[in-house]
Structure formats: structure tokens, C-alpha cells
Curated annotation (Swiss-Prot):
Belongs to the GreA/GreB family. Necessary for efficient RNA polymerase transcription elongation past template-encoded arresting sites. The arresting sites in DNA have the property of trapping a certain fraction of elongating RNA polymerases that pass through, resulting in locked ternary complexes. Cleavage of the nascent transcript by cleavage factors such as GreA or GreB allows the resumption of elongation from the new 3'terminus. GreA releases sequences of 2 to 3 nucleotides. Keywords: Coiled coil, DNA-binding, Transcription, Transcription regulation. GO terms for biological process: DNA-templated transcription elongation; regulation of DNA-templated transcription elongation. InterPro entries: GreA/GreB_C_sf, TF_GreA/GreB_CS, Tscrpt_elong_fac_GreA/B, Tscrpt_elong_fac_GreA/B_C, Tscrpt_elong_fac_GreA/B_fam, Tscrpt_elong_fac_GreA/B_N, Tscrpt_elong_fac_GreA/B_N_sf. This is Transcription elongation factor GreA. The gene is greA.
Length: 714
């Protein structure tokens, strides 16, 4: 344990031992400014600060050994923050230190304010004096109480006040010097926060031109930050939200080659700025020595040679990486040994017999499949697949197996392109397509991937004429797939299909259903209505698209969809509500407006504003309610049919455990979820509508069977 750690551990719990060790520390021949600053800041906020204040002068000999720098000034400022003796020696030292400001017009007044003129009490004098000298129009400060960055708009040494405009406050604030000493910290004009607040447009342009420099500035001024924290500091303030992902990806690539930013090992760890810079090879050495995991060592070497290929121009660096890789004890013909061989061969010019065609051809089908799945580096997976294709007679079987099982689209692309060129493999894939059309859940990820390619015309399997019909068959299967996976672990695949189908204003669907038969379109509309991913608006668009293709699909009575079903009781209640809105609340509101107008100036009249806003709300409510009443149709016994689920029906659902629930389907005015009365437009009701006894519905992720349908009048 070094001095810093020992002193920090003794500070609170063993003060007497701390002061004994401090005496020993003062005799150090080598002084670290960073270490001294950390220690003094800890002391300043600790319980021993008053006691240490009496011996604060003991820091001066250590301070004198430091080279001239901001670091040295910081140490002395901390000494004066802690000291309590106000000795003559310290006074002389302080006066000498502030002499650099003597050309300032407020120099003498500042001496008086911080206590250096009379020399009686001058704790904190250097920090306070530096702040006073910084208080000039156009400079920036940071408010410790939550107001953020501020720009100085004016200062009066006579009144001892400063006027500051803060980013977190609507109006400029007058702050006394006494408060400023406690709450404000000076910011240089090139500080990250000052640049972001002072000229955001110029800072955004700079960030787009040199993203690494901006992140260096951020980390240097604000300290280590992880990716999420960096995003919070930049997005919306420097980089617009819509541009963030692209900008950040570009910045990350460039940061890998920056010797001042140490990248984290995980997303939760911070990026660290090192002003002195570091050696990439030393960073690799540290990474390799700190791990016994062969997989991690190979990954570290791969990242190094991929991102920092220029470092390999130094032969010593190249030989170091080769030596480290060859020293790994790996089983032959394993995924790790194959990765090492590829790394040595492709990046380091050290060819390995392990990659010879003879050796690849000797591997069994299961061995090759296992190696591909256990190679962690994607580019090496692709390279090994190319070797299998070139060298192994069993490549078709291996590629087919990978096509059916992999979740990596890049690998699926590679094996698919190779397979469709081979006649037998192509026939096998066509058989798999037919099987997936019948059972899309047979190979769910492959089905979704292939459907997207077929619709986009990028499958390479079908002719233009065949693709149209296959696309329609696959669309029907896709809708069935979306319905079945909605509440399953594969629901993300359903969301992916949904995004594709509704994208570009339903372009894929418009292309597929073009010139389709009326029977197909009826099935299409029915299947889409069962997919919970589609909103009511989506379903309306899908029906409209189908009706454009086959106008005969249009309902005989166009108004049917627009009917708002209601019971007679609810109809009477809503008419009474409309009368109340028109005859009472609007009249009362008119009086409110007149009363508020009588109060005077309408620009500053909040009562008038609120009254007008209430009038607008009432008018909108009256408009909507009037429209609904005009569309309303009272539900009668003759309008309810129980051969399938519809409005006015009571439906008994039975789950897989045999438990039953009864739901009533009525219009939106009568809906009451607590009493299990559903609106006809609700998701569950729409899931049930049109179905008959014995059919299943998906509710809360579970299957329920329709056991009974009856009328509300039964």
C-alpha cells in the first residue's frame, strides 16, 4: 500500500496515526502533484480539516518541489482553503501568488475583499481571488446548486455583485460575491461546458468535423464517462437525436486509433482520457497479462491487429503478437485453434498447416458444424465457411444445417448464396420452402429471413412469374405466423414482420396483393384481423388496399363500420350529457370569459386565458359527442346474432386449465372492464369477433377456447 492509500485509510478512523504518517510523507524526495491534490481534497472535506489547518504550512516545502504548472497552482490554492493560521509567511506567499493579476483594474479591491489587504483572515483567498479576476463580461461559470453553466453579463465591484445568465434559469440572476464564492466555479472558454453553452452551433459543427476531439474535451473536463453518460452530455445539446447513432458509431471507430482515450471493456465501464497518451502495444500487453482465458486473448489480439494494423509495421510488435498467440495451449481442430491459425495467417503472415485443404477435408460434418458455431469472431466464421466450401465434400450438408439453424443473417446469406448455385442443394431448399409455407414455425428465423428476400426479389430461387404466387403464399403464412408468435418468446420475429409489412406505406403488401383474386383477398383480410401487431388503423388500411384491388370487397352498406352501437340507457345518458354541455357548461363558461375580461389587460390575464382554454375544450367535447350521437344505433334483440361472436353477445372463454370467464361485448359507451363488459373496438373483442364456438383466441399470452355464445337478452 502506498502513502496515498495509507493516509486515506487513516484519515477518518485513526487521526493520530495519520499525522504521524504525514510527517514522514513530508520528507519525500519525489513529489507527485496529482497525488498531493487528491490528498488535500480528501483532507478538505474530512473531519480532520480543522486540525490539519494548523499545520497546512507543512505542505509548502512539497509544493516548492513541483514544476510550474496549473497543478502547482491548484495545490497552493487547496493549502489556503484548508489553512487556519493566517501566518505572515502564508500572507507573503499569497500576495506573491496574486501579483500576476496586478494589472487588473479591480486588483486592489479584490485584495480587500479576500482579506489580503489587512492580512488578518485570508482562508480561501487564492480560490476567491482567482474567481474575482475571472468575473468579466463574456466569461463562463458553473453553478454548484443546479443552475448549470452561466455566462457573465455584468459585474460590479462597488456593489459586490455579478449578473449571470444560466442555462437552467429563464432570467439573468444577480449574485453577490459572497454567494459566488460558495456556488460558482470559473470555466475557461475552451471548457466543454462553456463551449456547449456559449456557442452551440459552432460546437456542433466542430463535433461533426472532429468527433474524437469533442469526446477528448468532454472526458478531460468532466472526467471518465461511460457510453450512456456521454450520450446524455451530447445528444440534443450538441448532436441532434436523429443523427446520434450514426455520429456515435463513427466516433467509436475513430476513438480506437486515439492514444489519449482508453476504451472500456464493457458498456457500463467508462471511457478515460489520458493527457499523456498511452502505447497501444502496452495496452495489449496489459490485457493479455490480466487474463488466463484463451478466447479473450485471441479476441484482444484480433481487435489489435484489425483496428491498429499500422502498429504491426514495428517488427517487435508483430513478433510479440505472434509469440503470444503461439504460446496458447489449445486443443487441435478446435474453434479456438482455427481462430488462432486464421489470425496468424490472415493478419500476421504466419501460415499454419491447420488451414490446409487436406486437414479441412478430414474433418467430419459434425466437427465442421461445431467449429463454425463456436468461432466467436464473425469474419473468421466466414473464412472458415469458405474453406469448407472449397475443401470439404460434405459442404452441402454443413451449409444446409447452418442455413436452418443460424441466427446470424450474414452467415445465412453466405451459405444460402453458395447452396442455390448447386442443383441438388437448390432442390432441397425449395422443398424446405414448401414445408415452411405449410408450417412457418418449423424454422421461424429462416422463414422470416426468406420471406423478406422473396418479397424484395433478392431470393435468387424463383422466376419473376413464380415469385408473385410464392410471395402470396408466404404472406398468408406470415400473417398466420404473426398471430401464433404474438405471446411467445419469438414475438420479436412477429414485430420484424410487422415493421416490414407496414413500411414504406405498406409497399410490400401492395406489391404482393396486386391482381390477387377476391378469394385470396378475403383470406388476407381475415388473417390480418387476427394479428395483434396490427392496429385498428392498420387494419383499415389493409382492407382499403384489398378493396382497391377488388372493389367487390366493399361492404354493401358503407356506413356499417361507422356505427356506434349503444344500449338505450347509454344513448339517453349521452344525449343528456350533450344537453348539459350546451345548455349549462357553455353558458357558465361564457360568463367566466366576461368576468375575466373585466379584470383588465388581457395579455397578463391568466383567468381570461384559462376561460378561453376551457371554452375550446368544451367546444371540442360537444363536437365529438354530437358526431358520436349521430352515428349511434340502439342495440335491439333483433340485431344480435349468436352463430358467431359479435356486438350484443355474451362469450364464455375457457383456458387450458379449464377455468371459465364470461365477457359481454357492447359499444364503447357501455364498456366496463371491471364487470367484464368489453368495447366492440377493444383488442380482445376484435380477437373474438367473427369466431364461433370451439375456436381459440389468444388472451394475456394464453390460449382460450370459445365455449359458449349467447345474447345479452337470453
Amino acid at each position: 500500500m502506498d502513502y496515498l492509500e495509507k493516509l486515506q485509510s487513516l484519515m477518518e478512523n485513526h487521526p493520530s496515526d495519520f499525522f504521524s504518517l504525514w510527517e514522514e510523507y513530508c520528507f519525500n524526495d519525489v513529489v507527485s502533484g496529482d497525488e498531493l491534490i487528491v490528498l488535500l481534497e480528501k483532507i478538505k472535506s474530512s473531519s480532520i480539516a480543522p486540525a490539519f489547518g494548523k499545520i497546512a504550512e507543512s505542505v509548502i516545502p512539497l509544493w516548492e518541489q513541483l514544476p510550474e504548472s496549473e497543478e502547482k497552482d491548484k495545490v497552493l490554492s487547496l493549502v489556503f482553503d484548508i489553512q487556519t493560521t493566517n501566518s505572515k509567511r502564508l500572507l507573503e506567499l499569497a500576495l506573491q501568488q496574486v501579483k500576476k493579476y496586478e494589472d487588473s483594474p479591480n486588483y486592489k479591491e479584490a485584495l480587500r475583499i479576500v482579506g489580503l489587504r489587512d492580512g488578518i483572515f485570508f482562508t480561501h483567498c487564492l480560490r476567491h481571488f482567482a474567481l474575482l479576476m475571472h468575473l468579466c463580461e463574456g466569461n463562463f461559470v458553473f453553478h454548484q446548486g443546479g443552475w448549470g453553466v452561466g455566462e457573465i453579463m455584468g459585474v460590479s465591484f462597488l456593489q459586490q455583485k455579478v449578473l449571470v445568465e444560466f442555462e437552467g434559469v429563464l432570467t439573468a440572476k444577480d449574485i453577490s460575491f459572497e454567494t459566488a464564492f460558495r456556488m460558482l466555479s470559473p470555466l475557461k472558454k475552451d471548457h466543454f461546458l462553456a463551449r456547449r453553452f456559449g456557442d452551440p452551433d459552432a460546437f456542433e459543427a466542430f463535433a461533426r468535423k472532429d468527433p474524437v476531439a469533442v469526446i477528448e474535451c468532454l472526458l478531460k473536463d468532466l472526467g471518465p464517462k461511460n457510453a450512456k453518460e456521454i450520450r446524455n452530455e451530447l445528444v440534443g445539446l450538441v448532436i441532434p437525436e436523429e443523427d446520434w447513432s450514426r455520429w456515435w458509431q463513427s466516433a467509436k471507430i475513430k476513438m480506437k486509433k486515439d492514444s489519449h482515450i482508453l476504451a472500456p471493456t464493457s458498456s457500463k465501464d467508462p471511457y478515460i482520457f489520458d493527457p499523456k497518451g498511452f502505447s497501444f502495444i502496452s495496452q495489449l500487453q496489459a490485457s493479455l497479462s490480466g487474463s488466463n482465458d484463451a478466447s479473450k486473448k485471441i479476441a484482444s489480439c484480433y481487435t489489435f491487429v484489425r483496428d491498429l494494423g499500422s502498429e504491426l509495421k514495428d517488427e517487435a510488435n508483430r513478433q510479440f503478437v505472434i509469440k503470444e498467440l503461439k504460446s496458447l495451449d489449445l486443443p487441435a481442430d478446435s474453434a479456438l485453434s482455427i481462430q488462432r491459425a486464421m489470425l496468424l495467417s490472415e493478419f500476421l503472415g504466419d501460415k499454419s498447416s491447420e488451414l490446409d485443404c487436406e486437414n479441412i477435408a478430414k474433418l467430419s460434418e459434425d466437427q465442421m458444424f461445431d467449429i463454425v458455431n463456436h468461432i466467436e469472431i464473425l469474419s473468421f466464421q466466414k473464412s472458415f465457411l469458405s474453406l469448407i466450401h472449397s475443401c470439404s465434400p460434405a459442404w452441402v450438408s454443413v451449409f444446409t444445417k447452418i442455413l436452418l439453424t443460424t441466427s446470424t443473417s450474414i452467415l445465412r446469406d453466405q451459405v444460402f448464396k453458395a447452396l442455390i448455385v448447386d442443383k441438388k442443394a437448390r432442390e432441397s431448399i425449395l422443398e424446405k420452402v414448401s414445408a415452411m409455407i405449410e408450417q412457418p414455425l418449423l424454422y421461424p428465423e429462416l422463414f422470416v429471413w426468406l420471406f423478406l428476400r422473396v418479397v424484395s426479389g433478392e431470393d435468387g430461387l424463383f422466376s419473376e412469374s413464380d415469385r408473385k404466387e410464392i410471395g402470396r403464399q408466404m404472406l398468408a403464412s406470415a400473417l398466420e405466423f404473426m398471430h401464433k408468435v404474438a405471446g411467445s418468446p419469438q414475438k420479436d420475429l412477429g414485430k420484424k414482420l410487422y415493421s416490414f409489412l407496414v413500411g414504406q406505406r405498406f409497399l410490400a403488401i401492395r406489391q404482393i396483393i396486386e391482381n390477387a383474386s377476391i378469394d385470396y383477398l378475403k383470406e388476407f383480410v381475415l388473417l390480418s384481423s387476427k394479428c395483434p401487431q396490427f392496429t385498428q388503423g392498420d387494419l383499415g388500411v389493409l382492407r382499403s388496399l384489398a378493396e382497391v384491388v377488388q372493389p367487390a370487397l366493399k361492404r354493401r352498406v358503407a356506413e356499417e363500420e361507422n356505427i356506434l352501437w349503444t344500449t338505450s340507457e347509454s344513448f339517453t345518458r349521452m344525449k343528456a350529457k350533450l344537453q348539459s354541455l350546451i345548455g349549462k357548461e357553455m353558458v357558465d363558461n361564457a360568463k367566466e370569459i366576461e368576468d375575466a375580461r373585466a379584470l383588465g389587460d388581457l395579455r397578463e390575464n391568466s383567468e381570461y386565458k384559462f376561460a378561453l382554454e376551457r371554452r375550446a375544450r368544451l367546444q371540442e367535447e360537444i363536437r365529438v359527442l354530437s358526431e358520436e350521437i349521430n352515428r349511434a344505433k340502439i342495440l335491439t334483440k333483433d340485431a344480435v346474432f349468436t352463430n358467431s361472436v359479435g356486438v350484443g353477445c355474451k362469450v364464455v372463454l375457457e383456458d387450458e386449465q379449464g377455468e371459465e370467464d364470461c365477457y359481454t361485448i357492447l359499444g364503447p359507451w357501455d364498456a366496463n372492464p371491471e364487470e367484464k363488459i368489453l368495447s366492440l373496438k377493444s383488442k380482445l373483442a376484435q380477437e373474438m369477433v367473427g369466431k364461433t364456438v370451439g375456436e381459440s383466441v389468444l388472451f394475456q399470452g394464453k390460449k382460450h377456447k370459445i365455449k359458449q355464445i349467447s345474447s345479452i337478452w337470453d
